[in-house]
């Protein structure tokens, strides 16, 4: 029986580590929103509306992120979870 317990004990997820990782993602996302330009929320909404013209999506499944480097370079990252085709 102790051999089976040995294998079972290694598979338990550490919830504290998982919670910490999720919190770090949320904090990083909120920091990015603070530094975004004033027009960014409207631009994000318009991008979602254009996508919805062609594909039925859930707006919560769309992430738009603007990364700005010190080299005056801006990168607009768009991630859309598309529905599976039937």
Swiss-Prot record:
<protein>
    <recommendedName>
        <fullName>Cell division topological specificity factor</fullName>
    </recommendedName>
</protein>
<dbReference type="GO" id="GO:0051301">
    <property type="term" value="P:cell division"/>
</dbReference>
<dbReference type="GO" id="GO:0032955">
    <property type="term" value="P:regulation of division septum assembly"/>
</dbReference>
<keyword id="KW-0131">Cell cycle</keyword>
<keyword id="KW-0132">Cell division</keyword>
<comment type="similarity">
    <text>Belongs to the MinE family.</text>
</comment>
<comment type="function">
    <text>Prevents the cell division inhibition by proteins MinC and MinD at internal division sites while permitting inhibition at polar sites. This ensures cell division at the proper site by restricting the formation of a division septum at the midpoint of the long axis of the cell.</text>
</comment>
<dbReference type="InterPro" id="IPR005527">
    <property type="entry name" value="MinE"/>
</dbReference>
<dbReference type="Pfam" id="PF03776">
    <property type="entry name" value="MinE"/>
</dbReference>
<dbReference type="InterPro" id="IPR036707">
    <property type="entry name" value="MinE_sf"/>
</dbReference>
């Amino acid at each position: 029986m102790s051999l089976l317990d040995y294998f079972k004990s290694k598979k338990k997820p550490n919830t504290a580590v998982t919670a910490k990782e999720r919190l770090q993602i949320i904090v990083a996302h909120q920091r990015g929103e603070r530094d975004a330009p004033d027009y960014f929320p409207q631009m994000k909404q318009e991008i979602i509306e254009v996508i919805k013209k062609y594909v039925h999506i859930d707006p919560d499944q769309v992430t738009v992120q603007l990364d700005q480097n010190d080299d005056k370079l801006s990168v607009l990252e768009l991630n859309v979870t598309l529905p599976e085709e039937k």
